[in-house]
Amino acid sequence: MEIFIAAYFLALIVEIIIRAPIDRKRRQGRISERRVTTQEQLLLGLLTLGGFVVPLIYTFTNWLDFADYSLPGWAGWIGVLLTAGALFLFWRAHADLGLNWSPSLEIREKHELITRGIYGVIRHPMYASQWLLSLATPLLLQNWIAGFLNFLVFIPFYLLRVKAEEQMMLDSFGAP
């Protein structure tokens, strides 16, 4: 099972590596509009807790061992495949968005509405990648708390964020 836990954390490291150069360059541009709510910030904090902090606690302490379950090896490998798909979508979405990516709802000067690349096939590939990772996590971590917490927090985040993001895109770029 350690290999599946390692796969989970490797995926998080790969996401950081993919995002870091874009995030660094993005900070140099000027924001022309920002729509960040307290609710969104709270949910982002809970996502960090559920997707990173709790899995770290699970991995390096025995505090959550009472919530462990055991799956056959093939289930963990399905988790690895889902994670690989998630990382591909995550990478492709960042490659296509470039400096148009932002961790919060922001429109930057010279912002473009991206409809090419993966965005020409999947409307929200970044969120699709996180759905895949959320589905993979219980297969990789095999713990009722560490495995499912991120998924449970991602649901309200997704429902809140996509609606607000869609409205911001409509307000900024009009109907497609």
Could you tell me what each predicted segment is?
Residues 125-129, 176:
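Loop-to-transmembrane-helix entry motif
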Residues 111-119, 128:
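Alpha-helical membrane-protein architecture signal
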